[in-house]
Amino acid sequence: MHMTHLIRPVAMVAALLTLTACEQPSDAKFKPASETTVAEAPAATVQGVEEAREFVAASETTLERLAQHHERVSWVLANFITDDTELLAAKSAEQFTLAQVAVAAEAARFNGLEGLDYDTARKLNMLKSGIVIPAPMDPEKTAEQSEIGANLKGMYGRGSYCREDGGCLALGELEDIMAESRDPAELLEAWAGWRTVSPAMKPLYARQVELANEGARELGFDDLGTMWRSAYDMDPAEFPGELDKLWEQVSPLYEALHCHVRARLAETYGSEVVPAGGPIPAHLLGNMWAQSWENIYELVAPPQTAAGYDLTAILNDEGYDAISMVKTGEAFFSSLGFEELPETFWERSLFVKPADRDVVCHASAWDIDEQDDLRIKMCIDVNAEDFKVIHHELGHNYYQRAYKGESYLYRSSANDGFHEAVGDTLALSITPEYLAKLGLLDEVPDASGDLGLLMRQALEKISFLPFGLMVDQWRWKVFAGEVGPDGYNELWWQLRERYQGVGAPGDRPADAFDPGAKYHVPGNTPYTRYFLAQILQFQFHRALCEIAGNEDPIHRCSIYGSNQAGERLNAMLEMGRSKPWPDALAALTGSPGMDATAILDYFAPLQAWLDEQNAGRQCGWQ
């Protein structure tokens, strides 16, 4: 869990920032964001080049020291949840936030300064654009924004739906209903019930947008959306179009999946509930936000779905425990030529849930000292899911170790989609062939079960793509003032129908604020990174399989045992954020442009099957 570069200036503080965790065509005009995003300062305020260089060096030293302290305090909190550790972590986060805020404000003094060397210019932009929600310079407005941010998160965290009989359901309980129920009336009640928590957020969110835009303009950006997009090594105005180009590449596969799923749902619920040729009602897809459709697998699965093995049962039969599962993950990376993990990793990580205290069980990878104090924190169960998650989390650790030689601001992924993509890429290599090489399978199963495996992955990964794209498309339009509070909800559903082919199940109330029912909106967490991670992981996987000499379909490829693949992967990882992400991408794939066609290659057998199933069906949506 690398503490990235996001914190906002002193006299202003506020709401704790979320930690920030790209794109394609080779003809895109990539250029340093510092040349494209920041308003030029009056000549009288321009500081000397040497002063700028010294400022950056001093800022890195200060932020690195505070970040390491905060990382240690956060680790203690995650492993020992008490009132005292919460207070210590909050104080540490406040100190780090204040320092970052001060640094961002100071960095804006150098706007428009010519003659800067590459690293100084790049790092100045990082210091300014790394803040998620910039506060205005006015202390009263800063305090107001801090209070709004805390209130929005609190409203979401305390949210629940209370039925007429007085019984109240928290989000987790409502999510269980969405995942398990097949009663459309019950699903609709749970879906609409959760959205009763968000209307009260709308005026607060609208005010937060005003304040954050003011803060962004004071740092030299047109608005907050421009500031967020400035982190992608290209003209922020061009970035949304580049994302749409990626979406256009993969949308035929999504539309085929959508067509099949809608037809099967119509068979289950009837055409009155699921009209032909229209958007799928959002409450029927097994997830509170219709962002993942895994929970309706049995309704849409191909007829031949057996994988031929039960990995959870095999792991238990073979006597695996938490440590041996992590050792197996480490051995995967060793087979690629990476060094073994340090002894401190095994001494300091959390692998199983303690019996004597509460801990944060959500799996995460940590880099405490930004050198070699690597750790993971998991409450590992011996099952197939955690076996995959371990490989994913170790991918973060090896990425963190690879870029440790870079300076503080460059110790991060090439863009905020790369870190998650690397973890997911390595999880794609957990194939039957890999399991056979480990001795967990006697032989590699034939391809008869591949469609079922691919369908499960598509319901997780392909269904997510349009949602991952549209959340920030909505926010950017809000930040740019293209729509006011009265139009927030209408725009939200316009974008959901345009990209997802998913619609609200009925008219929404006039005061509805459905974006607020998704944590990342009131929590102010940028979302494009998740879309990018889904695209990148398949592009990485295809390139690594080619480097490894794989001749099988890429959904059956594992790079286990390939030193050549490991060398190319490390060449990208060790760059960190020192170069524009197209350079890092080219170091691995040979091309600087993101390319979603790797997804089409991976899911080609499923696409062919879907096209057969959809013959004669009315696909698309109005």
Predicted stretch roles:
Residues 25, 30-52, 84-86, 125-129, ...:
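C-terminal, non-catalytic "cap/extension" segments appended to globular domains
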Residues 30, 37-207, 225, 518-521, ...:
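N-terminal helix-rich structural modules
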